Amino acid sequence: MSLISRLRAVVAGDDYLDGELDDFAYDDEQDDQDQRALQADGGALATIGDSNPFDLGGDLPGSNVIGMPGISNAAAEVNVMEPRSFDEMPRAIQALRERKTVILNLTMMEPDQAQRAVDFVAGGTFAIDGHQERVGESIFLFAPSCVTVTNTGHDEASAPTVVSREADAADVDEYASAPSPAWGAAAL
């Protein structure tokens, strides 16, 4: 008795040695016969040409294919919210979870409640790997990860123009002109 036979005898018991387990019929033999019959009828090329490579078995009852949540052919949706209290903030989080962009106009709220609301929605946005951007005074944009937010005019808008009332007309023109670029200031 070989080593492998001994291991089989120990693991499977004596039934394996009697050959009773070899009597089971397997479906593999039937599949091999069907494959040979198809090749004999038209060859391998005929079976490939007759089948539709894009047929995913849609005619099968009870298909297990489930669409991905949030992926649709519909246009992107933007929710503009003007909350009056912090109690309305969960609606903003729910909209973000539904992959909708949210613009919060917090001018109607008290400053401390507005700060709390921004912190709450910013935390929810961070949790879903989203983006946040300040659009204006007390106006914020929150977007899910499927939306790309770019800000091209932020540097130009952040440089305020300062004009003093006591300055003469020549100084006003100097202050009112566009600021010089940062890379040119070092050369002066």
From Swiss-Prot:
Its main location: cytoplasm. It comes from the Bacteria. GO terms for cellular component: cytoplasm. GO terms for biological process: division septum assembly; FtsZ-dependent cytokinesis. It is found in: Cytoplasm. Keywords: Cell cycle, Cell division, Cytoplasm, Septation. The keyword Transmembrane does not apply. Homodimer. Interacts with FtsZ. Cell division protein that is part of the divisome complex and is recruited early to the Z-ring. Probably stimulates Z-ring formation, perhaps through the cross-linking of FtsZ protofilaments. Its function overlaps with FtsA. Belongs to the SepF family. PANTHER family: CELL DIVISION PROTEIN SEPF (PTHR35798:SF1). HAMAP family: SepF. This is Cell division protein SepF. It comes from Synechococcus sp. (strain CC9605).
